[in-house]
Curated annotation (Swiss-Prot):
Protein name stated in the entry: Uncharacterized protein C8E11.05c
GO CC entries: cytosol; nucleus
Record organism: Schizosaccharomyces pombe (strain 972 / ATCC 24843)
Keywords: Cytoplasm, Nucleus
Region (Disordered): 1-72
């Protein structure tokens, strides 16, 4: 069933109703013919659109096709007023229902919040009861029970033994230290001599080549004694200082050489004069030392040449003696065979 049409305030029917209310209901209603014709067309159209009006709201004269237009219009207005009242009541009821539902829902939420607050208060009360401050016990071993504890430990493990005294050794610590230093000392490594090596000798023998026996190295025992006699630590050797060697302070000379130009710019004239005198004296000492060591070097070179010539003469003399001895032995052997 289609709902009855709702008339707006701009409709001519409601306009008539408002005019009646403003006149207090005593003035007569003047209907425009054009408005009445349009209203009639609207009513006819609504009736053609299956618009039904509640029959008990209309009187028996409304069902009569021949009726006065004014009375019919008044009845339509009353029916629309009834419809408006019905819709307003329905709207008010829906609002009241929604309000009650919201009130009930808010009441439920409030109840839940109260329950949560009560639970939290109960939990807080329990938590306050559970957390309490207490003093941390301090373990101390000072008491009457310490002696009893020590007696019990001694009865189980026995009395503690006194440490044994170490007798003084009869060995000399200085001698032990010197032996230890020799033991941990790195050996002196020498460059291998390929011409006198045994590997070269074996290689030449296997290849069938002639070998000079004088080029062979001595036996390992002889080699060890030879090396031990030849290896001398230079740090343990102190050269005797000659009497005629001039004196030179090498540390002072190095300090003078390290002074730069910037350090001399801020000095006074007197300090610069003293510095020049010190430089001249140091330079004179250095020249004397250089001349002395140059002479020593030249003398050492001359001695070296002399020793080399002597050694060369001795080698040549030994070769001549060897050759003469071989010739003598060969002559003697030939004479004996004859």
């Amino acid at each position: 069933m289609a709902s009855p049409p709702i008339l707006s305030r701009e409709s001519p029917v409601l306009g008539l109703e408002e005019e009646k209310k403003s006149d207090g209901g005593n003035s007569e209603v003047n209907i425009d013919p054009s408005a009445s014709s349009s209203l009639k067309e609207d009513v006819d159209g609504e009736e053609g659109a299956d618009t039904k009006i509640d029959p008990h709201l209309l009187e028996e004269d409304d069902l009569n096709p021949v009726e006065d237009y004014d009375s019919k219009n008044q009845k339509v207005v009353e029916a629309s007023k009834l419809d408006l009242d019905a819709t307003s009541t329905v709207w008010a009821e829906s609002l009241s229902i929604n309000r009650e539902a919201s009130i009930s829902q808010s009441g439920i939420v409030d109840n839940e919040m109260e329950k949560k607050v009560e639970e939290e208060e109960e939990f807080d009360e329990f938590d306050d009861f559970g957390e309490f401050e207490h003093d941390i016990p301090i373990c101390t071993f000072m008491g009457d029970w310490q002696d009893d504890f020590q007696d019990a430990v001694n009865s189980v493990f026995g009395l503690p033994e006194t440490p044994k005294t170490i007798e003084e050794s009869s060995l000399d610590p200085d001698r032990i230290l010197s032996l230890w230093q020799k033991l941990i000392e790195m050996p002196v490594l020498q460059r291998p001599d390929w011409l006198r090596s045994s590997i070269r000798h074996i290689f030449l023998v296997t290849m069938g080549l002639p070998v000079d026996l004088d080029e062979l190295l001595p036996t390992p025992s002889t080699q060890g004694s030879f090396n031990s006699s030849r290896t001398i630590e230079l740090s343990s050797v102190t050269l005797p200082k000659s009497e005629d060697e001039p004196y030179l302070d090498y540390s002072a000379a190095r300090r003078l050489c390290s002074i730069n130009k910037d350090a001399l710019t801020h000095r006074s004239h007197e300090s610069l004069q003293q510095h020049i005198e010190l430089l001249e004296s140091t330079l004179q000492q250095a020249v004397e030392v250089a001349r002395y060591w140059t002479d020593k070097r030249d003398s050492a070179l001359s001695d070296k040449l002399l020793y080399e010539t002597v050694v060369d003469d001795l080698v040549q003399h030994s070769k001549r003696l060897r050759n003469s001895g071989r010739k003598f032995l060969s002559r003697r052997s030939t004479s004996s065979h004859k």
